[in-house]
Curated annotation (Swiss-Prot):
This is OCIA domain-containing protein 1. PANTHER family: OCIA DOMAIN-CONTAINING PROTEIN 1, OVARIAN CARCINOMA IMMUNOREACTIVE ANTIGEN. It comes from the Eukaryota. Residues 205-215 have a biased composition (Basic and acidic residues). It comes from Drosophila pseudoobscura pseudoobscura (Fruit fly). Residues 155-164 have a biased composition (Polar residues). GO terms for cellular component: endosome. The lineage of its organism: Eukaryota, Metazoa, Ecdysozoa, Arthropoda, Hexapoda. InterPro entries: OCAD1/2, OCIA_dom.
Length: 260
C-alpha cells in the first residue's frame, strides 16, 4: 500500500505510458474502422473463403482429400471458408492502417505513423529484442573494476590453460620415455634398424627387353604352339561289282531279281 505523505495526502498514482490507454475513438475513426471491416469482408474474406471452400469441395470430389463418412465434403468446405475469412481480414490490416493514417487530427493515425517510422513510444521492436537490449546497457554490463581476478597477485602461477611443461625440472633417472621395458628388451629402436638399400629403377628399354624374352620363351614352349587343323579324311569310293556275264538275273512276279 502507498504510505501517506507528511501532510496526509497520498502520492499521485503512476500514469500508464501507453499512448492508447483509455483512448476514445472519434467519429471519423469509428467510421473508418467500420468501412475497413466491410471492405475487408467484401474484398478479401469473401473471395478467399469462396476460393478455399471450392478447392476443398473439388479436392474431396476428385479424391485428393478424404471426406467425412457421414457428411462428405461439408467439414472440409467449412474449414476452408473459415480459413479464408481470417486470411482476408489479416491481409487487409495494412490497407486499413493507411486509411486511418490519412485522417486529419487523428491520434490513432499519428501513433500508427510513428510505429511505421520506428519512432515514438510504440516501435517495431519485439519484447525479446527489448529485453536483450536492456540487459546490454551499462548498469547490467560488468566493468573492469567489478570483475575480481587474482592474476595480479600471483602472476607466476600456471593455470590449466597455460601450463609451462618445458621449463619444469626433470631428473635424468626418472625420464623413462626411451627406457626399454620387459616387452621390448630384445628389440632395437626403430631409428637403429638398418635401412634396406634402394632398388634401382627400371628403364623403358629394360622392360621392353624383358617383355621380348618372356614372349620368346612362351613361343618355344610345346604347350603354346598354335593349333593346326587336321587333314580331312577322304572316303574311298566302293565300285559296284560287275554283273555275271553268263545269264540274265532271275526275277519273280514282284520284280525282285537274284543270281544263282
Amino acid at each position: 500500500m502507498d504510505s501517506p505523505l507528511s501532510d496526509g495526502s497520498r502520492p499521485p498514482q503512476q500514469q500508464n505510458l501507453h499512448p492508447l490507454a483509455d483512448y476514445q475513438f472519434s467519429a471519423e475513426e469509428v467510421k473508418a474502422l467500420r468501412e475497413c471491416n466491410t471492405e475487408s469482408f467484401l474484398q478479401r474474406s469473401l473471395p478467399f473463403g469462396t476460393g478455399l471452400g471450392l478447392l476443398a469441395y473439388f479436392g474431396v470430389k476428385n479424391g485428393y482429400l478424404q471426406g467425412n463418412g457421414k457428411y462428405g465434403a461439408v467439414p472440409k468446405v467449412v474449414m476452408g471458408v473459415i480459413l479464408g475469412y481470417f486470411v482476408g481480414k489479416f491481409s487487409y490490416q495494412q490497407k486499413c492502417a493507411e486509411k486511418i493514417m490519412r485522417l486529419p487530427n487523428s491520434r490513432l493515425g499519428e501513433v500508427l505513423r510513428q510505429r511505421r517510422q520506428g519512432g515514438g513510444v510504440i516501435n517495431t521492436i519485439s519484447p525479446d529484442e527489448s529485453l536483450t537490449r536492456a540487459f546490454t546497457l551499462a548498469p547490467f554490463s560488468p566493468s573492469s573494476a567489478d570483475v575480481y581476478t587474482d592474476e595480479g597477485l600471483n602472476p607466476s602461477r600456471s593455470t590449466a590453460l597455460n601450463l609451462d611443461t618445458e621449463s619444469r625440472p626433470t631428473l635424468a633417472g626418472l625420464d623413462d620415455i626411451y627406457r626399454p621395458s620387459l616387452d621390448s628388451s630384445g628389440q632395437m629402436m626403430d631409428t637403429e634398424l638398418p635401412l634396406e638399400p634402394a632398388k634401382p629403377g627400371q628403364t623403358y628399354e629394360d622392360l621392353r627387353k624383358k617383355n621380348r624374352e618372356g614372349y620368346a620363351t612362351h613361343q618355344q614352349s610345346p604347350y603354346s604352339k598354335p593349333y593346326e587343323p587336321q587333314a580331312p579324311v577322304r572316303q574311298r569310293l566302293v565300285e559296284p561289282a560287275p554283273e555275271a556275264a553268263t545269264g540274265r538275273p532271275n526275277k519273280n512276279k514282284y520284280g525282285d531279281s537274284w543270281q544263282d
